[in-house]
């Protein structure tokens, strides 16, 4: 079968590898769709992550497909089911798992980051990580359940109040998901800052009340222009250091700043502690998707969340190395690899 195999920084190869054998509690999935995530970009760029990605690993952790084989102990799905995958396999017995914060599991296995993932034609997955969905939902939509689950965890931590004001910095896929979730949480005003015009237009279509071009408009002035007196929640989804610093500056009194965008491990920001003290700002961060995957999938299936509009385009597996190597292409929008 064809697979995208990572070897080292800037070295991802499309190769023929054997179809994996499954154990008693695993399923074999014919992968149909796998999204390119920011984590994939960081791995390709050689950045250190939460766990090292071994040479020879097949990347891809946002994927869906069809079950073609099941182990004898599998009870949750059947051959022919359409499924998507939660890529974070927890051990269940470390202190973090037993303490109810399993996303910090000391023995976590990352499908597509530490073991083979979805950028391959066939993938073996433990039954505990597989979620069936109706065949009326496209494989591309279902592959978006993983990033939605991550966003749900972040929004849960923001404590967005009904009638409040939310500012989202960054209008890529994550920012556009956050925009919709903030609206569903009851925010009366959601502002979104994004330099690319097409993404601002899409943000307005998805419900943004205020859109801001940060290259040509002053963020604080634009908010004042729309009579925004206090921003209660700021969600930084761009992963840029300057955006995190700006989030702290524009945050209102007694507000929450969610640092959601992924930065490089060795990057630092300049923060004025007095500003945080004076405004009683709460700084928060969000790590992967503990216990939110089912909710994410249900929101996609119910149509409460539009995940199709933010897909920039689909591509073949053979195009993947070129997309990862092209920073301009990477920034254009969300890619889904079809297999």
Predicted features, each with a name:
Residues 7, 18-19, 54-60, 111-115:
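Short Gly/Pro-enriched turn/cap motifs at secondary-structure boundaries
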Residues 137-216, 221:
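Mid-domain Rossmann-like dinucleotide-binding core that forms the NAD(H)/NADP(H) cofactor-binding site
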Residues 20-34, 48-95, 134-136:
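Glycine-rich beta-strand-centered segment in the early N-terminal region that forms part
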Residues 241, 245-249, 290-339:
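C-terminal hydrophobic helical "lid"/dimerization subdomain
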Residues 195-196, 263, 289:
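Residues in the short beta-alpha loop(s) of Rossmann-like NAD(P)-binding domains
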Residues 91-169:
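NAD(P)H dinucleotide-binding glycine-rich loop of Rossmann-like/cofactor-binding domains
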Residues 158, 201, 205-280:
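Glycine-rich cofactor phosphate-binding loops and adjacent beta1-alpha1 units
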């Amino acid at each position: 079968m064809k697979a995208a195999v990572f070897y080292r920084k800037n070295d991802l190869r499309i190769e023929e590898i054997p179809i994996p054998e499954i154990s008693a509690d695993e399923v074999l999935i014919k992968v149909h769709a796998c999204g390119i995530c920011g984590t994939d970009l960081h791995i390709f760029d050689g950045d250190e992550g939460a766990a090292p990605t071994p040479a020879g690993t097949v990347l891809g952790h946002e994927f869906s497909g069809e079950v073609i084989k099941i182990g004898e102990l599998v009870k949750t799905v059947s051959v022919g089911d359409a499924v998507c995958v939660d890529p974070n396999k927890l051990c269940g017995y470390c202190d973090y798992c037993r303490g109810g914060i399993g996303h910090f599991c000391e023995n976590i296995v990352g499908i597509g980051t530490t073991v083979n993932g979805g950028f391959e034609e066939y993938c073996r997955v433990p039954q505990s990580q597989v979620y069936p969905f109706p065949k009326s939902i496209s494989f591309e939509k279902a592959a978006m359940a993983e990033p939605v689950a991550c966003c749900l965890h972040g929004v849960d931590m923001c404590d967005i109040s009904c009638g409040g004001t939310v500012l989202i910095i960054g209008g890529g896929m994550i920012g556009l998901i956050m925009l919709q979730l903030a609206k569903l949480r009851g925010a009366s005003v959601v502002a979104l800052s994004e330099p690319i015009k097409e993404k601002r237009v899409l943000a307005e279509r998805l419900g943004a009340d205020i859109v801001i071009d940060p290259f040509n408009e002053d963020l604080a002035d634009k908010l004042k222009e729309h009579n925004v007196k206090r921003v209660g929640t700021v969600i930084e989804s761009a992963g840029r250091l300057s955006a995190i610093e700006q989030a702290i500056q524009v945050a209102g009194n007694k507000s929450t700043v969610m640092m959601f965008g992924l930065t490089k491990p060795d990057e630092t920001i300049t923060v004025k502690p007095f500003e945080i003290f004076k405004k009683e700002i709460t700084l928060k961060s969000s790590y992967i998707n503990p216990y939110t995957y089912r909710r994410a999938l249900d929101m996609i299936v119910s149509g409460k969340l539009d995940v199709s509009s933010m897909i920039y385009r689909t591509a073949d597996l053979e195009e993947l190395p070129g997309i990862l190597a092209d920073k301009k292409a990477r920034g254009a929008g969300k890619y889904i690899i079809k297999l």
